[in-house]
């Protein structure tokens, strides 16, 4: 088989002084950071959908890319050609993982029977590609939002037959993920939301979604899948309002249906932007709630109200994200999946490499800066000092439930409390972070 990216052998680390645009300048897989190889810290993955399925179409124009596997032809043959190119790309980019939706890798077909048969054939193809290349599956998922049947959602659809079709896709995709050794299975809401409350029963839809997720957990245990189940929050788009709005909202949902010990979060940077949060906030919130699982690394545009899915390029933003992740012990089954696409005008096939190389260098440099912050320990020290009062006898009695509200009121009066505000020193801390970022 002739190589598609025939002008490139493999992307290699050449260091920061190199001017080669098809080389890594900061990402050195074997470099030790805090005693662990950089590759093991970052656990990079490339996604199938934006990289090999998107044809460059948008709401105002048709497809702009010339991809051989997107031309007319026999669907399964084209899917196999796409897999050839995908694994050539993964190998040449040095990513240890990839991610997919079911219909990214396999033709959907005209019926459930065709869908299942096509997917089974493509799972065998992917298994062979993984064996040959050493690339592993970070996570799989089912696309329960693109087909018109999902216009009113999948699990939240008013029609139980649509709910059942979605269940079939999730069963099939999860079992495929299990067979391929996937380390996680992702559930993204897609169209699990509403356009107008005039035709929506919020309680009914929430109950449906909760039961669907309970069944997903039940099936995971039934088939012996040892990976992590992940929900990916997003506030809107394609629906006006989605039920998995942000990390805190999903936590409340999971608690309501007794799922908080079973499902974690896959946090996407651009979705945080759409929810009015920083990426840093959503990562820190997921960690604080005990739900952190994995990351879709990309960026949005603060001036635009939609999911632009650009490649991450801000070391400043991602250094703080990696700092939170390192403090929490790093990834376990999760990783950094590049849920990002080249721009519509980026029509050269090697633009796919430029986007990923820049993103991988960005995250590698962010990791090294975060490691310096961890080793120095000054930020943690400042936070510990700020909350040190809670280690006092009074603070501990409050936290351990040894004092009631009335007890505290009595204590405050008896001790004539007159606390004085202590500076938060935000400006000083921002200068400290800039020191880590810019001072060698």
Curated annotation (Swiss-Prot):
Annotated residues for binding of Mg(2+) 1: 232, 268, 296, 339
Cofactor stoichiometry and binding remark: Binds 2 magnesium ions per subunit.
Residues annotated as the enzyme's active site: 101, 104
Single GO MF descriptor: magnesium ion binding
Any one cellular-component term (Gene Ontology): cytoplasm
Domain of life: Bacteria
Cellular compartments annotated: Cytoplasm
Binding site for Mg(2+) 2: 268, 271, 307, 309
Enzyme Commission identifier(s): 5.3.1.5
Keyword Isomerase: yes
Family: Belongs to the xylose isomerase family.
NCBIfam families attached to this UniProt entry: PRK05474.1, xylose_isom_A
Protein name per the record: Xylose isomerase
Species assigned in the record: Escherichia coli O17:K52:H18 (strain UMN026 / ExPEC)
This protein's encoding gene: xylA
């Amino acid at each position: 088989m002739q190589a598609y990216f025939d002008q490139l052998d493999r992307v290699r680390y050449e260091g920061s002084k190199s001017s080669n645009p098809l080389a890594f300048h900061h990402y050195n897989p074997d470099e030790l950071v805090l005693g662990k190889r950089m590759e093991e810290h970052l656990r990079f993955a490339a996604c199938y959908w934006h990289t090999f399925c998107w044809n460059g179409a948008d709401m105002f124009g048709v497809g702009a890319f010339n991809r051989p596997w997107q031309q007319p032809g026999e669907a399964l043959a084209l899917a196999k050609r796409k897999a050839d190119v995908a694994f050539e790309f993964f190998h040449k980019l040095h990513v240890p993982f990839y991610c997919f939706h079911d219909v990214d890798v396999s033709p959907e077909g005209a019926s459930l029977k065709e869908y299942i048969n096509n997917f089974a054939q493509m799972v065998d193809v992917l298994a062979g590609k993984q064996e040959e290349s050493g690339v592993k599956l970070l996570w799989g998922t089912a696309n329960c939002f693109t087909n018109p049947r999902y216009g009113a959602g999948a699990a939240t659809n008013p029609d139980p037959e649509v709910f059942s079709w979605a269940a079939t896709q999730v069963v099939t995709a999860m079992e495929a993920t299990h067979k391929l050794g996937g380390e996680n299975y992702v559930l993204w809401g897609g169209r699990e939301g509403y356009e107008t409350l005039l035709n929506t029963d919020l309680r009914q839809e929430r109950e449906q979604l909760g039961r669907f997720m309970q069944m997903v957990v039940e099936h995971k245990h039934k088939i012996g899948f040892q990976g992590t189940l992940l929900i990916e929050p997003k506030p809107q788009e394609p629906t006006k309002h989605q039920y998995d709005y942000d990390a805190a909202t999903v936590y409340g949902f999971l608690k309501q249906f007794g799922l908080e010990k079973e499902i974690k979060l896959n946090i996407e940077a651009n979705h945080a932007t759409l929810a009015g949060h920083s990426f840093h906030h959503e990562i820190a919130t997921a960690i604080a709630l005990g739900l952190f699982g994995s990351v879709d690394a990309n960026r949005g545009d603060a001036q635009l109200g939609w999911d632009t899915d650009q490649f991450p390029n801000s070391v400043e933003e991602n250094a703080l994200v990696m700092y939170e992740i390192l403090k929490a012990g790093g990834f376990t089954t999760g990783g950094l999946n590049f849920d990002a696409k080249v721009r519509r005008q980026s029509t050269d096939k090697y633009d796919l490499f430029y986007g990923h190389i820049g993103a991988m260098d960005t995250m590698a440099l962010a990791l090294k800066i975060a490691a310096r912050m961890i080793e120095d320990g000054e930020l943690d020290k400042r936070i510990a000092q700020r909350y040190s009062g809670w280690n006092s006898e009074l603070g501990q009695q409050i936290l351990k439930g040894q004092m009631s509200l009335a007890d505290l009121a009595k204590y405050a009066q008896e001790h004539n409390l007159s606390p004085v505000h202590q500076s938060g020193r935000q400006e000083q801390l921002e200068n400290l972070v800039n020191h880590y970022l810019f001072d060698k």
